[in-house]
């Protein structure tokens, strides 16, 4: 708090733009004096932790904080309709909705691979031409919920199903251990952070996006632009 306040107070900023439920609270408290001096505070909510179907603890913990702290912001920006509708009932005087983040659909729709490249890319991951490749893209964190797909793969128990997980994050070891405990470690491929998502979407058969919380959801939009069948949760901005 002291470090943030020192930065805010020493900068003489016109606009202080904060993100995320925790850091935005810290920043708004730290910026009270700056606001009195004329600085504006903008808060971009990347998806409220409370939403239709969210755990009760999320509503108990996050809703009162967001409601109370909304009075200490000059503009509250949301990125999906559910958050926007709810934020209108808060104390913020200026609530906006960003209607969408740009996606270059041609980058995915017009992306064509040669047969040789298709085979080579799948082989590099450990997947044959006859296997069913299930793809997901996202941080390896609890709210991305990759574990539900790993459990589903184990329950289906089909020899030719392979789950390719793109991304990195703190839950990687837990997910690897889960796959091992279910005896499907050889079917779950953790390929890390990738810059060739358009290629991977073209060689995949199914895209999954099982998030339990999502502000907007760019990854499933990219999958749809690639023409992939999509299995997704229906939360937040999805």
Please identify what each model-predicted range represents.
Residues 176-192:
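Nucleotide-activated donor-binding/catalytic signature segment of Leloir-type glycosyltransferases, i.e.
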Residues 229-232:
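Short hydrophobic beta-strand element within catalytic cores of glycosyltransferases
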Residues 18-24, 45:
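Short His-centered aromatic/hydrophobic patch
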Residues 2, 40, 50-72:
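Nucleotide-sugar donor phosphate/pyrophosphate-binding loop at the beta->alpha transition
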Residues 132-155, 170-176:
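A conserved mid-protein helix/loop that constitutes part of the nucleotide-sugar donor-binding site
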Residues 67-118:
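Donor nucleotide-sugar binding/catalytic pocket of nucleotide-sugar-dependent glycosyltransferases
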Residues 217-220, 238:
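Short glycine/serine-rich donor-binding loops of glycosyltransferases
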Residues 193, 212:
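Aromatic "clamp/platform" in nucleotide-sugar-dependent glycosyltransferases that forms part
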């Amino acid at each position: 708090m002291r470090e943030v306040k020192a930065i805010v107070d020493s900068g003489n900023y016109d606009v202080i733009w904060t993100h995320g439920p925790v850091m935005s609270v810290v920043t708004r408290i730290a910026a009270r004096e700056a606001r009195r001096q004329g600085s504006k505070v903008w808060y971009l909510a990347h998806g409220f932790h409370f939403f239709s179907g969210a755990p009760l603890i999320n509503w108990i913990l996050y809703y009162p904080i967001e409601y109370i702290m909304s009075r200490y912001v000059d503009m509250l920006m949301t990125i999906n309709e559910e958050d926007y509708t709810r934020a209108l009932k808060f104390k913020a005087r200026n609530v906006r909705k960003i209607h969408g983040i740009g996606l270059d659909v041609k980058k995915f729709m017009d992306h064509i691979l040669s047969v040789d490249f298709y085979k080579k890319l799948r082989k590099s991951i450990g997947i044959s031409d006859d296997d069913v490749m299930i793809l997901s893209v996202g941080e390896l964190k609890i709210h991305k919920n990759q574990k539900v797909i790993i459990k589903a793969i184990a329950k289906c128990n089909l020899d030719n199903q392979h789950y390719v997980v793109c991304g990195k994050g703190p839950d990687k070891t837990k997910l690897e251990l889960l796959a091992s405990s279910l005896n499907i470690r050889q079917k779950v491929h953790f390929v890390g952070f990738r810059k060739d998502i358009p290629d991977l979407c073209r060689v995949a058969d199914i895209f999954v996006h099982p998030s339990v919380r999502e502000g907007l959801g760019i990854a499933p939009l990219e999958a749809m632009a690639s023409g992939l069948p999509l299995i997704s949760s229906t939360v937040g901005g999805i």
